[in-house]
Structures are given as structure tokens and as C-alpha cells.
Amino acid sequence: DRLLEAKAAFLHSSFITVGGEGILFAGNKQAGKSTQAALWNKYRGALTVNGDRAVIRLEGGGLRAYGSAFCGSSGIALDESAPVKAIVLLGQASENTVTPVPAPEAFRELLGKMTYDTSVQSSVEAAAAIAAEAVARVPVVRLVCTPDERSVEALEAALWRK
């Protein structure tokens, strides 16, 4: 797969930029990816670059996200990119909490949300290498949250130490 050869892969996530940095909201269907992107747009003026499948790529010593044509039901697919500030694994709750995800768990979660051919060993190995390096380069946090501004405030405080 040419994408994997370029140290890049699709990640099932909503991708926003705020202050020139990217945040990837990753989760299963109905986890709140589009909701979080919309909340960040409304309350922090973030730009939603992609609503369903961003491309992540290992570049230099960091991780960069790119918009893709695969936007799901959001219809949002912009040709933009940004260095990744964090990957946020989503869950729903009545209170907002942000916790760091240990590397082994972050690796499993990330690999499970990437798109690659599981029947081809070299694709599996390449995707695993990208996932391992991605979690070593950028913070992966779990945000369990309410669908309102308080979730934005909680994540912002955790990522920017406000």
C-alpha cells in the first residue's frame, strides 16, 4: 500500500485545527467525534478539516494530519494539514474527565482505528509501526465527556495546561 510506504495511514477520526495545531477525535461510531469537532468550532473557532477519516503521517520528529476525501456523513473534507497536538479517544459520560492513555493501550486503540489490509502481513506490520511511532510522538488522551462546552474546557485545560 503506497500510503503505508509513505509512513501514513487513514485514521477513523474527526480532525480539527485550532491555533495552527491539529486535534484528532477518534472513536467508534456515535462516540461523539463530529459533536466534539462542532463544539470546538462553536466555542473556540476551530476549523473542522475532516469529519470521518483523516490521514496521519510520520514527519520529521512529529505526526502530521491531513484532510482526506473520505468525510462520512459530515460532508467535511478540506485540503488542509497541521502538526498533531493530540489524539483524543472519546467516550460519553455525565462528567468530563481527561486522562492520559498508557502507550500499550494507546497503540491498540490507534491501530484498531486505522485503515489497512489485515490480510497482508506487510500492511499489518507497516500500520503497527506507524501506530507505535505515533503514540511515542504525540499525547494520546481519553476524554469521557458531556456534549457541551464543558468538554471543550476540560480538554483545553489538559492539552494547554490552563
What are the residue ranges of the model-derived segments?
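Conserved glycine(s) of the Walker
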Residues: 31-33
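Glycine-rich, often acidic-flanked micro-motifs
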Residues: 12-14, 18-28, 41-162
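Post-Walker A alpha-helix
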Residues: 36-37
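N-terminal pre-Walker A segment at the start of P-loop NTPase domains
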Residues: 1-10
